[in-house]
């Protein structure tokens, strides 16, 4: 893991086309602005985990429904 210190107004680059800038530093929070191509998906980690869990639950439900339907002929 790379750890980088940045001050308000400073940026870092990921590759050639993603720029992350520190826009505000408050008590207990840092506000970032992200400039990236529209093709790049940017999600907060907690939201990503929530979506991932919902997808797992949905897939499990789909399988049980298919098994029930398969049993009916």
From Swiss-Prot:
The gene is csrA. Transmembrane segments: none annotated. GO terms for molecular function: mRNA 5'-UTR binding. Pfam families: CsrA. One of its GO terms (cellular component) is cytosol. GO terms for biological process: bacterial-type flagellum organization; mRNA catabolic process; negative regulation of translational initiation; regulation of bacterial-type flagellum assembly; regulation of carbohydrate metabolic process. Gene3D superfamilies: Translational regulator CsrA. Belongs to the CsrA/RsmA family. InterPro entries: CsrA (IPR003751), CsrA_sf (IPR036107). A translational regulator that binds mRNA to regulate translation initiation and/or mRNA stability. Usually binds in the 5'-UTR at or near the Shine-Dalgarno sequence preventing ribosome-binding, thus repressing translation. Its main target seems to be the major flagellin gene, while its function is anatagonized by FliW. This is Translational regulator CsrA. Keywords: Bacterial flagellum biogenesis, Cytoplasm, Repressor, RNA-binding, Translation regulation. Its main location: cytoplasm. It is found in: Cytoplasm. Homodimer; the beta-strands of each monomer intercalate to form a hydrophobic core, while the alpha-helices form wings that extend away from the core.
């Amino acid at each position: 893991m790379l750890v980088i210190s940045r001050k308000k107004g400073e940026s870092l680059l990921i590759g050639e086309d993603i720029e992350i800038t520190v826009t505000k530093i408050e008590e207990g929070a840092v506000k970032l602005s992200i400039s990236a191509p529209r093709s790049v998906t940017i999600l907060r980690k907690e939201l990503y985990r929530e979506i991932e869990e919902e997808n797992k639950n949905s897939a499990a439900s789909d399988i049980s429904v298919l098994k029930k339907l398969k049993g009916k002929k």
